[in-house]
């Protein structure tokens, strides 16, 4: 066990984490040259295209160090984006050390700081590594000082490398061997294995990635999942090199996979503990905190025939992504679907994209919303993650909205424009510190403003240099109202949203004007209205198409023409009463994409 090293890499998007892991695999001969490709561990197409890591992956490599000994390095890859922080905490729970990889040209970013604190809280040894030192703009000394000032860990003598051209990679591996502590645990104790990740394989059933804390698990043995108490037999176990490599056993300190023919998707929940069926341990491994969804949206299939496939796809995804929440929902406008909970907007986009790509579904997503608290006059508190749960306006004493504390790191040239967008988003400044060339700005902002388009706006005003990390801190009363959309007097539930009263008229007008462009003209007039309660705040009309009923009258008496026109008018009136307006799917999609709450 003394030669095992479990570690993960903490790094911001684009700081070279995936490239560095490729180099580790190359140096340790994990794959042949022919099998090597860039970003080996980013196995999803979306990960490659967007250049981000979404899922945690693991690799076991044998490294012969300069002292002549062979070490088993278990490297657990982690995502860098703020929406996937849950994946990060899962990966860190299985490690003893973490490499803090920082781009020597760009410096420290906000999400790196947040993930680094998570690692420190879990008592991991954090080792700073300065990457991309081959760039002409690299300033390793300045960045090392930034690490010390912002994060507070000693970065003097930090290992430098360039993963892209392969300089210093062996030095990094030597640093891991020297500084990451060996795992603690007893090979002969009762089995305790923590499930770090699970995914569904069509041939093997559920595949679980586990970190064995104590004891040994062998092929053919029976184990049970502690939360459910169900026992299974091990069919295959082994490690990823990054290909699957079968072994006879996994012992304390090791990280590997277990296949036990589990067909039930919820058979091995992430964060659970496995133990022997015949000689179980009493207490599970302390897992990681259950994450609460922050953003909710309705998801519907365009054709209702795909509903069963949609449910199955969501179940398979939720096995692989423990932070996804869903429950059935019915919308009058969009039919049957699911109300889904996500960690943030990027998480929502990725889930939608994965459902569409991996499961060939066509989906519509309703406007995202956060969880509000409605306090009724009788004192009852209702958590509103869906507008249908909002009580009647007369019964509500106040609505409270979630407030997040956002920590923003930007170069000092952009401070003014960042403060401007924070004020526009109803933010309250808490703190502002200058650290070297960077400025750390802390604001309390309404969560709905942050999850809609704050990140994109921040990136554009800071030319891509701004970074953001946020966490929910409290609820506070706010003047929120429910904005309904009526078409010919009928409410369209899919387009309703909760907005701040000051912005309601502007949002209502914008929504109505956009719908006017998208709803095709009918044979009768279509009135589009935005309303708060019983008050109409905006209105627009799609004019009726008109058939020329006088075309067959050549000259002749004017009363004949009047009679035909009156008849047409009557017909239109009757049509308006009984005619229903078909709203095309494109109109929904276009409006929902643009609703920036």
From Swiss-Prot:
InterPro entries recorded: EF-4 (IPR006297), EFG_III/V (IPR035647), EFG_V-like (IPR000640), EFTu-like_2 (IPR004161), G_TR_CS (IPR031157), LepA_C_sf (IPR038363), LepA_CTD (IPR013842), LepA_IV (IPR035654)
Protein location: Cell inner membrane
Organism this protein belongs to: Francisella tularensis subsp. mediasiatica (strain FSC147)
UniProt keyword annotations, A-Z: Cell inner membrane, Cell membrane, GTP-binding, Hydrolase, Membrane, Nucleotide-binding, Protein biosynthesis
UniProt-annotated binding residues for GTP: 14-19, 131-134
Protein encoded by which gene: lepA
Membrane topology: Peripheral membrane protein
Catalytic activity of the protein: GTP + H2O = GDP + phosphate + H(+)
PANTHER family reported in the protein's UniProt record: TRANSLATION FACTOR GUF1 HOMOLOG, CHLOROPLASTIC, TRANSLATION FACTOR GUF1-RELATED
Keyword Heme in annotation: no
Stated name of the protein: Elongation factor 4
Molecular function terms from GO: GTP binding; GTPase activity; guanosine tetraphosphate binding; ribosome binding; translation elongation factor activity
Enzyme class name: hydrolase
Documented EC number(s): 3.6.5.n1
Functional note: Required for accurate and efficient protein synthesis under certain stress conditions. May act as a fidelity factor of the translation reaction, by catalyzing a one-codon backward translocation of tRNAs on improperly translocated ribosomes. Back-translocation proceeds from a post-translocation (POST) complex to a pre-translocation (PRE) complex, thus giving elongation factor G a second chance to translocate the tRNAs correctly. Binds to ribosomes in a GTP-dependent manner.
Superkingdom, natural source: Bacteria
tr-type G domain segment(s): 2-184
């Amino acid at each position: 066990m003394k030669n095992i090293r479990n570690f993960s890499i903490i790094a911001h998007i684009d700081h070279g984490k995936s490239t560095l892991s490729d180099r580790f695999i190359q140096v340790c001969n994990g794959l042949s040259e022919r099998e090597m490709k860039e970003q080996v561990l980013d196995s999803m197409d979306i990960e490659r295209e967007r250049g981000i890591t979404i899922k945690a992956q693991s690799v076991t490599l044998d490294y012969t160090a300069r002292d002549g000994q062979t070490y088993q390095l278990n490297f657990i890859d982690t995502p860098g984006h703020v929406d996937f922080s849950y994946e990060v905490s899962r990966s860190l729970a299985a490690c003893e050390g973490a490499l803090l990889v920082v781009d020597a040209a760009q410096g420290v970013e906000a999400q790196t700081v947040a993930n680094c604190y998570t690692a420190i809280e879990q008592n991991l040894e954090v080792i700073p590594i300065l990457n991309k030192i081959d760039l002409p703009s690299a300033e390793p000394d300045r960045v090392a000082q930034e690490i010390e000032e912002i994060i507070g860990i000693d970065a003097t003598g930090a290992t430098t490398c360039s993963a892209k051209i392969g300089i210093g990679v062996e030095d990094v591996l030597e640093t891991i061997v020297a500084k990451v502590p060996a795992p603690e645990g007893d090979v002969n104790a009762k089995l305790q294995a923590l499930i770090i990740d699970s995914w569904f394989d069509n041939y093997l059933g559920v595949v679980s990635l586990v970190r064995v804390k104590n004891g040994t698990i062998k092929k053919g043995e029976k184990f049970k999942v502690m939360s459910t108490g169900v026992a299974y037999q091990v069919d295959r176990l082994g490690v990823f090199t990054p290909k699957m490599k079968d072994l006879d056993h996994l012992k304390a300190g090791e990280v590997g996979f277990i296949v036990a023919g589990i067909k039930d998707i919820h058979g091995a929940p992430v964060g659970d503990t496995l133990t022997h069926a015949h000689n179980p341990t009493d207490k599970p491994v302390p897992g990681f905190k259950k994450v609460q969804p922050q953003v909710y949206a309705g998801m519907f299939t365009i054709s209702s025939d795909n509903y069963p496939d949609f449910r199955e796809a969501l179940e398979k995804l939720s096995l692989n992504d423990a932070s996804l929440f869903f429950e059935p929902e019915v919308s009058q406008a969009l039919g049957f679907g699911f109300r889904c909970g996500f960690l943030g907007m990027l998480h929502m986009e990725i889930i939608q994209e994965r459902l569409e790509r991996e499961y060939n579904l066509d989906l519509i997503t309703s406007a995202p919303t956060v969880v509000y608290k409605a306090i009724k006059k009788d004192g009852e508190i209702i958590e509103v993650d869906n507008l249908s749960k909002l009580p009647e306006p007369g019964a509500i004493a106040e609505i409270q909205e979630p407030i997040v504390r956002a920590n923003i790191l930007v170069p000092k040239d952009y401070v003014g424009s960042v403060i401007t967008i924070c004020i526009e988003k109803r933010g309250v400044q808490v703190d502002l510190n200058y650290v070297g060339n960077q400025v750390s700005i802390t604001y309390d902002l309404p969560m709905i403003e942050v999850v809609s388009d704050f990140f994109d706006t921040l990136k554009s005003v800071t030319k891509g240099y701004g970074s953001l990390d946020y966490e929910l801190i409290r609820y506070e009363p706010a003047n929120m109202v429910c904005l309904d959309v009526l078409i010919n007097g009928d409410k369209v539930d899919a387009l309703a949203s909760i907005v701040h009263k000051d912005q309601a008229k502007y949002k209502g007008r914008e929504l109505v004007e956009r719908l006017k462009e998208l709803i095709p003209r009918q044979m009768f007039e279509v009135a589009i209205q935005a309303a708060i309660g019983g008050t109409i705040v905006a209105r627009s009309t799609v004019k009726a198409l008109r058939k020329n009923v006088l075309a067959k009258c050549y000259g002749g008496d004017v009363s004949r023409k009047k009679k035909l026109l009156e008849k047409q008018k009557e017909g239109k009136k009757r049509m308006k009463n009984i005619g229903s307006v078909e709203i095309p799917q494109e109109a929904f999609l276009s409006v929902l994409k643009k609703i920036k709450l």
